Amino acid sequence: QVISSAGQDNAELHLFSDFNKFYESPVYSSLDIIIECASKDAVREFSKRIIESKKDLLVLSVGGFSDQKFLSELQDLSIFNNAKIWIPTGAIAGLDSIRSVRKYLDSLTITTTKHPKSFAGAPYFKNSKIKLDDISKETVLFEGSAITAIELFPANVNVAVSIALAGIGLENTRVKIIADPMISVNKHEILCKGSFGEIHVIVQNIPSPTNPKTSYLASLSAIECLRGLCNENFRIGT
């Protein structure tokens, strides 16, 4: 049952945008599951309090789990408090397959292509010679590890952290980020190879109407994850 929710035009938005106020409210005490859709910094700041209050937590800003020490501590807390942490598939496909073959992976890469405006505000541009407004053709912004990518593009590549956690870790997962002014979708291309064979997934998502940094599919994935939790007697997928 949905006890309460807030959107941009919702009168209750002030309650949900101030975590301390929300944490002390009667609404919070009545909840079983908290859904995070704020930022990776919010995940690191508030997750432990949520788990310690014995609430389950569904996380969309998976980049908050790029700190392995923090994630391990949170997992220990969840066991102690009998609380669960859920990471939906998000704006990609194939996450269950990557989990299935994680012990047999040799390489795991993801190439993310978005319109330049999707990268507005990314810390990467503080020290880069590349200016978003000057990008007139497909431009590679970054190539490196998932752990570096999420720090430079915290609002754009949560999916890279998701596949890294499902697969061979953040240091070993390679990420390429491309800005393309001619593209109208958020494109993610995943390639993993190993003794099992190869998995090649391409997803082209419509950007969220209210936040072009992410994909509409990410919201739909969270909703489906929640729906699945409400019907644990029948499950499709790994």
What are these regions (language model features)?
Residues 1-49:
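N-terminal glycine-/serine-/threonine-rich beta1-alpha1-beta2 phosphate-ribose binding loop
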Residues 7-12, 75-78, 103-106, 127:
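Short, hinge-like loop/turn segments at secondary-structure boundaries
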Residues 10-13, 54, 82, 172:
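A generic structural signal for alpha->beta connector loops
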Residues 20-21, 62-66, 91:
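Short, acidic/turn-prone active-site loops that include or flank metal/cofactor-
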Residues 37-38, 60-61, 88:
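Structural motif
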Residues 41-48, 53, 62-84:
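Rossmann-fold NAD(P)-binding glycine/threonine-rich loop
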Residues 56-58:
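A short hydrophobic/small-residue beta-strand
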Residues 86, 91-238:
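Active-site-lining helix/loop region of Rossmann-like oxidoreductase modules
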